[in-house]
Amino acid sequence: MTEPGNLQPTFVGFIGTTVDALLLFEACRQNYTHFVDRRPQDRERERLIRSGSVFVFDEVQSGIKRWTDGIAWSPSRVIGNFLVYRQLCKKNSVSDRKRSSKSRSDSDEEEVSAFTVSVPVDVDVASHVNISSPSAPSLSDNLFPGSSFSASSQQNPSSPGSNDIKSEFAAVKNEYVLSPTSPTTSAAFPSSFSSLPLVSSKPTGTPFVPKSPPSSSPSTTNVSNASTSSAPINPRAPQTRRESISSTSSIHYCSSSSLSYLHDTERALVGSLTDSYGFKKSGLIKKTISLMIDGRLHHLISYYTPEDVLNGKLQTPSSFNLFQQLTISKDLLEYKSFRIPPLVEAAESEKISQLSTLEKRTLPSFPYNPFFSSSTAEIDPYHFQGLTLSTSPISGVESSSLSSAISRNQSNLSSFQQQQQFSALQSISNNALNENIEQPPIKMAARHSYPNFLQTLPQYMNDVYNPSGLAFNPVNPNANNSFVNLNLIQFTSPSQALFDYGEGPYVDQKSQYLQPKQPSSNTDSIDQSSYNMSLAASKQFLTSDTQPDVNENYSFISNSIPKNLSTSWNQNMGYHVTNSNSELASQNPLYAQQAVSMESMGNAIQSSAYSAMSTPHGGHYDHYAATAKGKNPLAAENHASGGRLPKVPIPPLSNMRRGSVPIIPSSASLPMRTSGNRFCHYSSLNGNHNRISARTNPYPINNQTMLFTEPLSKERGSLS
């Protein structure tokens, strides 16, 4: 027990949101700061009851049943999970009480109804005492629920009253309480944090008085020193209060009415107590919250003035390193009587902060920020600026003080997810917030060009699309100037698929790629009257037990493949192809290599160079490919031909739709978009055409499972 002269506040600062209060409760539980064990005496009130003082006490341990401070307060108003009171002028408190009493006598029923909706008090959650009936005790005779109440004050629930706090810790009715946080969110907060000692570093009774914030500019301030639970006020740039973000800003917020107070600086500080009573000029605001912890009621009472908060004189607990190391216990986060779950409130506050930060700059309206205008708006100094809530899918970057409790306990992400963080959203935010913000993004337009394929596959793509560990090597020149596609090896053996053909070195590519310098023919034309499809075929691969004669002549398979390509623009692929013989086929063979990953706005993507191609009427030429007899018996040889095949009735697939491009690998189900063409697998065994569609994003990616490797009868020698 502290001596009467040694009573000190638990904390000196500002309690912005519920997470701030929970951090302070947790700090008291772990003895990082202290509970107060008594009320301030009359001679101590002038010293203790001032802006910035925060008192936390255990009702049972301290024996405090009523918190008195000698100040006349207005009726309570609800702000989130808090109750707020505003200091009245003492000379007007009696007349205000009489005036409000008279108005209530005329419309008592309406007043009680409105009060019940905003502050539901007809059920005491803690003690389960019904206080809504006329015979039930009133709230005005005592501070906390569970005690006796008088019927007189129950009829006057919004009366200013005397110095006593009216219904300060009234419990919230069950039907107004939102569901607790989800298990996935709350699991990030363990019940204890073993690395923190449970020993107080300060003597009991000494208040935690935070030092003044550093004088660094806002642009150099470490973002981890900020808090997602409430806005760290910028001490270097005091700003005037905004009337309402939602009314003066062009941003259209989509939030529930229970969180609307976060969008208005005035409401966030004083609630609806604006002009209904005779408030004292530059008077105090009292903000309170009560929780049932370990079966006992704990209360937090804080005092502040709006001017001190807006001018940055008061900082929140979560903006200091001591509290950033604390892990909020699960029982506090999932306290069932919260009107708004703490993390929901914190996320909304941070969203406002981020949008306010972005809106202060002139941003292009499309495509990076379709919801923002180019106007510059005043920044709300109440909310945090430029933070990333660690509960979002993008993780791996140290964010705010709230993330110190969340991200520290998250499971490690795969390298793919970490890369996506930078390649996707961060690319958007960096472009949106760079110094050259006036320059709009370049809009993609139709053009005659070839896809710019990467020469090497990023490591994170190997991790995701190559679970077996085999490397996806691009087509590389070897000693005899042949081009080797090691991607073919994944189907059969680790041997390289090498063979010579006709006009020069050649290696069979994926079915969706057109090979350069193919001999054309007027035979074996394919019906051009139906959908644009690609015919994938495969042949018998020689095995080690059927070694061929190295002197045996090569056998050939003749398949029809399109000679000319359409000039239709494929918006997904971002390139335009015309007349394959003159453009694509005449180019260096490197243009025919496999397509690999191109980073695209956070989604894994899938497509092929062939998806933008269609065959005009009658266009075709033969595709000859030699079997690798004698060269490489174990090599996998896949052949393909493309063209307009007859329409084949097949059962609809779940992801089928008209105008699609090649399927995604069966091992990777990825969200995709499409436009343009269909792709059809052809089974050489049963002759069925399996038309499979998939949605893809704009850039190509490796597709290792495009071809079937069903064996053909060796006697047949060709496709049936």
Swiss-Prot record:
One GO cellular component term noted in the UniProt record for this chain: cytosol
Gene Ontology process terms (BP): positive regulation of gluconate transmembrane transport; signal transduction
Keyword annotations: Transport
Function noted in UniProt: Promotes the onset of gluconate uptake upon glucose starvation.
Molecular-function annotations in GO: DNA binding
Family: To S.pombe pac2 in the N-terminal region.
Signal peptide location: none
Pfam entry (one): Gti1_Pac2
Transmembrane regions: none
Low complexity bias: start-end ranges: 146-163, 217-232
Record keyword Transport present: yes
Protein name: Gluconate transport inducer 1
Sequence segments annotated as region (Disordered): 146-165, 203-248
Keyword NAD: no
